Amino acid sequence: MNEAAALAEVEIPAGAAEVLALAQSPQRFINREISWLHFNRRVLEEAENRNHPLLEQLRFLSISANNLDEFFMVRVAGLKEQVREGVQTPSPDGLTPSEQLATILASAAQLISDQQGRWLELRHDLAGVGIVLVDGVEVTAEDLVVLDRHFLNHVFPVLTPLAIDPAHPFPFIPNLGFSLALQLVRQADGRGMNALIRIPAKVERFIRLPDLGTGALRFITLEQMIGLFISRLFPGYAVKGQGVFRVVRDSDLEIEEEAEDLVRLFETALKQRRYGEVIRMEADAAMPAELRNFVARELGVNDDEIFVVGGVLALNEFSQLVSVDRPDLKFQAYNARFPERIRDHGGDCFLAIREKDILVHHPYESFDVVVQFLRQAARDPNVVAIKQTLYRTSSDSPIVKALAEAAEAGKSVTALVELKARFDEEANIRWARDLERAGVQVVFGFIELKTHGKLSMAVRREGAQLATYVHVGTGNYHPITARIYTDLSFFTADPVIAQDVARIFNFITGYATPGELDAMAVSPTGLKPRLLNHIADEIEFAKAGRPAAIWLKCNSLVDPEIIDALYEASAAGVQVDCIIRGICCLRPGIPGLSENIRVKSIVGRFLEHSRVYCFGAGHGLPSPNAVVYISSADLMPRNLDRRVETLCPITNPTVHEQVLDQIMVANLIDNQQSWRVLPDGSSERIVPAPGEEPFNAHQYFMTNPSLSGRGKSLKDSSPRSLFVRR
C-alpha cells in the first residue's frame, strides 16, 4: 500500500469504536519520510512567496534543492539498503521499506519538477530586474571574446576530455559531481564514440558576462560555457548529442561498535563514503535517450533512479547567485544585538552571570557573547578548568581557538569532539588533532551514542572556593549558522545546574552513569521519562478539572511513545500546541484522537532550531508556575534513545517569562510565516483572520529586546504582553 492509499483510508472516526481502532492502528502515525517531503514542500513554497525579495526567493529554492540532495544521500539510501537486503519490517505507520521507497520516488519526482518550474519563473523575474542567466545559444560575439579568454585561462587546464572505450573505462563520478556526456563523430571517417568531461567542482559555476551596455548582471553556467568549446577539447570531432548529468551517492556512514581507534575508523569510513552507491541520477532533458541509457548502464542506475530535468541541474548551487551585489533584492541586512546585561558589567560575563541568569536568543542576539564567555575563561587567571562539547563548528572556529589558548595558558581543558556529526566528520577529526596539539584533553564520547548536547563549563577560583559557570545551548557552537538559526543560549552560575553539567561531562568522558540528576535530565537515560512524566501529570490535572496545557517547540516529532502520550493527553482534555519545523508523525485535529492538538510549522527568514518544552503544571499556559525546559533534543527515537542530549529547566523568573511569554507566545501567534499541519500530514499557510493583526515572529524578535538580556538602559522597553488566550 502506498502512502496516498494509506492516507485515503484514514477517515474521521464516527464513534468510540472507530476512535479506538484508529488509536491502535499504525495509521495513527504519518510516515516520517512523507512528512519530511511535506516540510521541504513548505520550503519550496517560500520560494514562491512574493512577500520575499527576489534573491531571497532564489535562496529558498536553493535550500529546498540542497535539502532534497541530503535526504537522498541518507534516508533514501537507507531504504534502498533495506530493500536490497529483503527487509519487510514496516515502519510505525505500517509501510514496508519498498512501499515507502515507491512513494518517496514519486513524490520526489514531482518536487523536482516543481522546483524547475519555479526556477523558470524566477529566471524570468530576475531578468526583469537585471540579473540574467544566458544560454549558450544566446551568447554574443562580445561574450565569446570574454568566454574564450576565461576558458583558456581558468577552465581548460583543469578539464580532462575522456573517450569511453575498452582502453578508457568509464571514470568514477563523485557524489554531487557534474559531467558532460557526449556522442561524437570523427569527421575523417564518420566513426562514432562516446566521451565524457568531468566538470570540476572547484571552478566557479556561474561566469560573469559583459553587461552589453545595459547595466545588467549577466551570467552563464560553467557547463554551458564548456559546451561552447567542445572543439577545443575534441578537435576533429563533431558533436552528435550531448547532455549534462549529475549523481547523488549513498553518504551514510556505517561504524562498527567494536573499534580500537575511533579516529582511524572514521577516516577509513569517510574514504569509503566517497564511493557510495549511486542512488539518484539527474540528466538534462536535452540529452539523447541513447546517451542517457549508456550513462545509466555505466553507473549501474535503475530506471526509477533516473530523474530527467527540464531545466538547470544542481539548483542548490544557485546560492552562489544570491551573493551578487543587489541588496535591493535581499532581506534588509540585520545586525544582531549584543546583550546589554553584559555591557552593564563592563563586558565581564562572569560578573553578569553571577548576578542573574541570562538567556541569549540567537540570531537576534549575537553569538559573540558565547565566544566572549570562552575567551574570558581562557584568559582569566582565576579560571582553572574548562569543559566543552563540540558537535559542529565553523571552519575558522573562535571556539576552538579559545580552547587552545586556555590549554596553552596551563588550564585544564577537556573537549568532547563528536566524530559522528553527519557531513562534519572530517572537520571534527581535524579540530580534534589541532586541540590535542595545543594540550587539550580530547575525548570522543561513545561509539554507540552520538553526543548532541550543547554544554560549556568554566570552573573559577573565587576566594577560598570554586565557582562554576555554565552555558547550556539548544544549538551548535557555530558562529556562522548562529546568524541564521534560531537558538537559545542559557548562562547560569546556579550550583545545582552546574553540578548536573559536571556529572554529564563525567558520563561522557568516563562512562559514569549520572543516574537521576538534581535538575536537568539527560538522554538516553532520563530525558524521555521526564517528558512522559510531565505529560502524565497534565493528564491527571485535566481529569481533576484543573487547567492542563502543553506547549512543544522542536524540529521533529517522531517518537511513537511520545506521540501516543500526547494522544492520551488530548483525549483527557489537555490543550496541546506544537511548533514543529520539520517532520511531524502525529496526526492533529482528529476528533476523539487528537482534537485538542494543534500543530504548526514556521518557515521564514531564519531557520527555527530551538527546542522548548512547557507544561502548565495545573495552572495552564502561560503561567509563572509552569514547568519550562530548553533542550538540545528533538522528539525522535534517535535523540531520546541513541544520543546524549540535555534537558535544562528554566526557573529564574525573568528567563522563565522570556521563554514562555515572549518566545513561545510569539511563535504561537505568528500568522505570516506559519503553516497549519493537517491530519493527512500536508499543510496549509496560516493567514490572519478577519480583523486579526498580521504578526511576524521573526520581525518581532528583530525589533524587541529580550527580557533577560536587555540591561538597565532598556528596562522601560519591555515588550507588550503578546498572549491572547484562545
UniProtKB/Swiss-Prot annotation:
Function recorded in the entry: Catalyzes the reversible transfer of the terminal phosphate of ATP to form a long-chain polyphosphate (polyP).
Superkingdom of origin: Bacteria
Cofactors (names): Mg(2+)
Top class in the EC scheme: transferase
GO process annotations (BP): polyphosphate biosynthetic process
GO cellular component entries: polyphosphate kinase complex
Catalytic activity: [phosphate](n) + ATP = [phosphate](n+1) + ADP
One GO molecular-function entry: ATP binding
Active site: 452 (phosphohistidine intermediate)
Region of interest called Disordered, as start-end residue ranges on this chain: 704-726
NCBIfam families, per database record: poly_P_kin, PRK05443.1-1, PRK05443.1-2, PRK05443.1-4, PRK05443.2-2
PTM statement from Swiss-Prot or TrEMBL: An intermediate of this reaction is the autophosphorylated ppk in which a phosphate is covalently linked to a histidine residue through a N-P bond.
EC id: 2.7.4.1
Listed name of the protein: Polyphosphate kinase
Stated family: Belongs to the polyphosphate kinase 1 (PPK1) family.
Keywords annotated in UniProt: ATP-binding, Kinase, Magnesium, Metal-binding, Nucleotide-binding, Phosphoprotein, Transferase
Binding site for Mg(2+): 392, 422
CDD domains, sorted: PLDc_PaPPK1_C1_like (cd09165), PLDc_PaPPK1_C2_like (cd09168)
Record InterPro entries: PP_kinase (IPR003414), PP_kinase_C_1 (IPR041108), PP_kinase_middle (IPR024953), PP_kinase_middle_dom_sf (IPR036830), PPK_C_dom2 (IPR025200), PPK_N_dom (IPR025198), PPK_N_dom_sf (IPR036832)
UniProt KW Metal-binding keyword: yes
Residues binding ATP, per UniProt: 67, 485, 581, 609
Keyword Phosphoprotein carried by entry: yes
Gene3D superfamilies associated with the record: Endonuclease Chain A, Polyphosphate kinase middle domain, Polyphosphate kinase N-terminal domain
